Amino acid sequence: MAGHERLRHKSPAEWLKTVRAFEAMPEAVLKRLYAECHLQSVERGQTLLKGGEIPDALYIVTSGRFRTSRFASEPAKAEMGPGAVLAETAFLAREPHDTAITAVRSSIVLKLEWESFKALAEAAPDVWQGAIRSLVHTQGRVYAAPRTHADRARSLAICPAGGETVPANFAACLAEAIEHRAECQILSSEGLGQDLPGGIALDDPQVVHWLKEQESHFEVIILVTDPEPTPWTERALAEADEICLIGTHDGGRLGTPVPLGPVEELAFEMRGADACRLALFHDPRRGATVAGTRRWLEYRPVRSHHHLRPNQVKDFERLARFLLGQSTGFFASAPGVFGAATLGIFKAVQASGFEPDCFAGTGAGAAIAACLALGMDPDDVDQLVVEIMVERRALRRKSWPLFSLYNPRILDKLILKHFPDTDLADLPVPFYAASANLSTGEPQIHSLGNLQVAVRANWTFPGILPPFIDEEGQMLIDGSSISPPPIQPMHRLNAGPNVVARAAMPPFGKSPVRYRDLPAWQKQVSGRLPWQKPPEGPSLPSFEGVLTAANDRSGDERSWLGPLDMLLAAPIPHGTDVLAWHEHSHLKDLTYQWALNELEKRAAAGNLPLVAAIPTS
């Protein structure tokens, strides 16, 4: 489907159709519009539009990459590549654009000036009619596939990390993985004759034209830098949409941080760490076990890091998706037993052919996402939770309610037993968890550090277990109460689509007990012995249920969901308690069926961004 189709070159009409206001225009009208357009070259660092200005033209990126920021000198808010429409709303509304737009590298845009558009529209009313029809047609619609390929990289630079050179076969292996999605070409200084006496001047107009021509003929260009800073290395880093640092890891868990190599220093200086990803080759003699990744990350605050394990072709395929802007993610957020709902949702989207490239979670969803990132089957994850919470009765010891309702000692031992003592950076796929930090009042993002800590901090809702106190004295609790959900780190990792799995608690309804009758009701309920059945008659939500409902808020989803993210909020059956762990498997199965039906309905309505990432075979 759309997400797995090979990239192809666009016709003039197709470039114009990336503009929402032109999408439904007849072909004849689009041709008249295209006649008013012209191509414009934009040099790296050149500001195309200043913040606060009314755009005098509409720009469609055909080659290169741009960044938006409040001022040209500020950090980027977003980056946009081929297919992106720049300042579209401000252009049509004749309003100031709130951010500056600057070229990250040498780029080419298709430019339609306002005066030309206005003159054509006045002479041909069908231009305005087509624009209005398009805007009405697209109003409120969620696209089933990316409307543009703004986040898809067209040029990739690969360079050595640490003191080693890039392995000889790396570029070929990466190209093979990319070829399943796009035609690509590998360019190096050797291929350009840079190694010959006299070499080739990279600023020669013929060379510049030839390089641009390669980008137009191939869908992806892989630029292999030299082992040290050279004019070619600098050119490759400047022209790349994505920079991939390649290191060879010896597998040692302990040791000093790996220092930056000269090409890495140049890459960070020219483009910043956010333009870079780190890929680590792992020594085949150490098998598939990954350890010691933090030694590499100490000096490299990269956008993401990836593991290339021996004989794991899928690792190269995943890296290719990240570099091309076609990777996907799964974010699970739910407290207590409601985490089973996120597991059922994952099982449903997996059955539909969707395989996420990265995982994240809060609350019980953090433990579930961690297990999935480790490669566990959803049903095995379900059985693990049942063993910990039902068979081993992790919360069987209540505590005097000074700090929490339950004693955490048994649960802590079971987490240490069933979850690996590993660093999050060593997981085979990108992962993070988010807990709520009571010490700072801010979300605590766990992308590095011990996996067991991330799981324990999120396991049970606040008040039920005491906060987890880490080695720095930070008090951490279940992050499913964070509003809005902390999905921003996932947006930094990938372009999407991302599946956001949540549990939707039903309202409690009106109380069956009058307020003045509460003391008598409480006395009746609390007077029974543990083995006795609850008294017949009206019931009220449990203390745990009230706590959960009071913190069940995510705000307006439009403010935090990405344009391709898909929220699946599974309805929880009325009366299900957040600590009803014996219902875990049943709740997972109910949610699985609900999610399958929901995916089918959304697909039939054309409202399924997820479909863009599902292969056709």
Which residue stretches match the model-derived regions?
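Gly/Ser-rich catalytic serine loop of serine hydrolases
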Residues: 51-57, 161-167, 334-338, 357-366, ...
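Hydrophobic residues at beta-strand termini and immediately following loops
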Residues: 40-42, 80, 112, 187, ...
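Patatin-like phospholipase
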Residues: 209, 215-219, 228-359, 370-617
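Cytosolic regulatory regions built on CNB/CRP/Popeye-like sensor folds
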Residues: 1-168, 180, 252
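Walker A/P-loop phosphate-binding motif and the immediately C-terminal alpha-helix
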Residues: 150-199, 214, 319, 364
